[in-house]
């Protein structure tokens, strides 16, 4: 399970090359079969065991690749979900949302996002797209400012528009993905069981977290950029899906936008976008000494809170002593501005908040009490200090064609189904001004042409 050309493995500064002679998965190597999730788990267990006699606390980071593409998983997980997803995107997504409501994960009256509209061909780009004279709409320049250009957009077909062959291939992609998730769960179980076996489980803080929303690339008809769904439904290709068959398409197979919308349910948009489906991720925490499940934490938290939380668990106070000025004689810029002193080095301070108070129940309410935002690929969002409002910018054609910032009332519409910016001009105006002020203060520069990694 290794995407072509986009990953590397090192141990103690030495490259590990899976599949090569003498290397994991290669001739004469150990293990004989390399699957990253299995390999990482066993390596991490060996690291824990190598130092367990020193009596010191340990920090272990299991940075799994799975279930990121390529869609590959070994037996017995490869065929475990055969036929489970034949009902298609809508049926599976609706069933998941119903179960979320039944479990109390979302309110019974939660209004989910229905998915992006179908266009089976590229949404047209503006005439100047790709030319030197193009003036692309971005988060600071809208159509009202004279900027009107954007590139083409593509959206996957709905299930009802797929041919029988396309449905066959699409269902198989999700079967493989589900197998990858269960294999990941199995390996996490091995880690937890090992902690129990060595008597450390009850004394260990464990956090499981995804790094982003569901992966929806490529936003195009068909989920494999090197082969069509129709071709993937034919033998011998179909039977080889999910295996490392040595072909380039095996190294790039993914499940596409529509299954990503299923994974992101009940939220809007996917990885790379600032909609709730792109920025909301599952997190599960086990506290030292915890013996039973605790209530679900519903406060807004951010990945930057993790470091502050880990330090709090270890009883370490984050560094706060301001660093002395270090002015560049050529530019006049203080290179230590905003930094603090740590171990005689000048570093940026920990910006997150410890989650221990809310996790243990000693504090309630919002973790972040100031406006909080994020940005990727020029796609930005900002939450209001009270957590109610969310200003969001997405480039056309998936965002508004005039380039305006959208506004959602998260208190009643976390599914982001209704843009209420026109009804609340002062709210959206304040949030956008706050975002622009922050960008100006930190020297943030918007890309001239916002677009994602795809």
Listing of model-derived features with the role each one plays in the protein:
Residues 44, 58-64, 177, 181-184, ...:
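Beta-strand elements within well-structured catalytic alpha/beta cores of enzymes
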Residues 53-60, 200-206, 366-368, 384-389:
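Loop/turn elements at helix/coil->beta-strand transitions in domains of secreted/extracellular proteins
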Residues 72-73, 193-286:
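Histidine-centered active-site microenvironments of extracellular/periplasmic hydrolases
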Residues 56-58, 106, 110-144, 183-224, ...:
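Metal-dependent active-site segment of extracytoplasmic phospho-/sulfohydrolases and closely related
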Residues 112-152, 161-167, 396-405, 410-454:
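Long, internal low-complexity/basic segments
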Residues 249-278, 290-410, 442:
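C-terminal cap/loop subdomain of S1 sulfatases and analogous C-terminal strand-loop tails that border
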Residues 1-12, 20, 61-63, 70-80, ...:
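Short, solvent-exposed loop/turn and secondary-structure capping segments
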Residues 1-82, 87, 95, 101, ...:
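Formylglycine-dependent
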């Amino acid at each position: 399970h290794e995407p072509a050309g986009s990953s590397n493995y090192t141990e103690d500064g030495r490259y590990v090359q899976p599949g090569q002679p003498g290397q994991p998965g290669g001739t004469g190597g150990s293990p004989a079969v390399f699957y990253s999730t299995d390999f990482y788990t066993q390596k991490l267990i060996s690291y824990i065991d190598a130092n367990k006699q020193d009596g010191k606390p340990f920090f272990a980071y299991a940075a799994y690749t799975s279930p990121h593409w390529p869609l590959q998983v070994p037996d017995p997980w490869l065929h475990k979900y055969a036929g489970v997803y034949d009902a298609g995107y809508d049926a599976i997504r609706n069933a998941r949302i119903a179960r979320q409501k039944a479990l109390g994960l979302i309110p019974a009256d939660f209004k989910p996002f229905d998915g992006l509209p179908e266009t089976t061909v590229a949404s047209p780009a503006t005439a100047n797209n790709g030319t030197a004279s193009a003036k692309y709409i971005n988060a600071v320049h809208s159509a009202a400012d004279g900027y009107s250009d954007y590139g083409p957009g593509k959206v996957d077909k709905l299930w009802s528009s797929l041919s029988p062959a396309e449905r066959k291939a699409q269902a198989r992609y999700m079967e493989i993905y589900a197998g990858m998730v269960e294999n990941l769960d199995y390996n996490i179980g091995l880690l937890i069981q090992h902690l129990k076996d060595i008597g450390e489980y009850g004394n260990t803080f464990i956090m499981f977290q995804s790094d982003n929303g569901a992966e929806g690339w490529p936003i195009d008809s068909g989920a494999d950029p090197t082969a069509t769904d129709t071709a993937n439904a034919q033998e011998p290709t179909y039977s080889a899906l999910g295996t490392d068959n040595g072909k380039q398409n095996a190294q790039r197979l993914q499940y596409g936008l529509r299954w990503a919308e299923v994974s992101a349910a009940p939220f809007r948009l996917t990885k790379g976008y600032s909609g709730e489906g792109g920025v909301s991720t599952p997190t599960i925490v086990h506290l030292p000494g915890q013996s039973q499940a605790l209530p679900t934490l519903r406060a807004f938290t951010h990945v930057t809170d993790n470091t502050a939380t880990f330090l709090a668990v270890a009883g370490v106070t984050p560094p706060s002593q301001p660093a002395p000025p270090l002015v560049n004689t050529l530019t006049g810029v203080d290179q230590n501005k905003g930094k603090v002193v740590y171990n005689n080095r000048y570093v940026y301070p920990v910006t997150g908040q410890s989650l221990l108070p809310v996790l243990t129940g000693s504090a309630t309410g919002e973790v972040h009490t100031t406006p909080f935002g994020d940005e990727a690929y020029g796609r930005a969002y900002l939450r209001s200090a009270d957590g109610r409002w969310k200003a969001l910018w997405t480039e056309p054609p998936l965002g508004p064609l005039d380039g305006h910032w959208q506004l959602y009332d998260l208190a009643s519409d976390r599914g982001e189904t209704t843009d209420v910016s026109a009804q609340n001009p002062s709210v959206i105006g304040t949030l956008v001004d706050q975002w622009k002020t922050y960008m100006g203060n930190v020297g943030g520069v918007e890309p001239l042409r916002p677009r994602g990694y795809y």
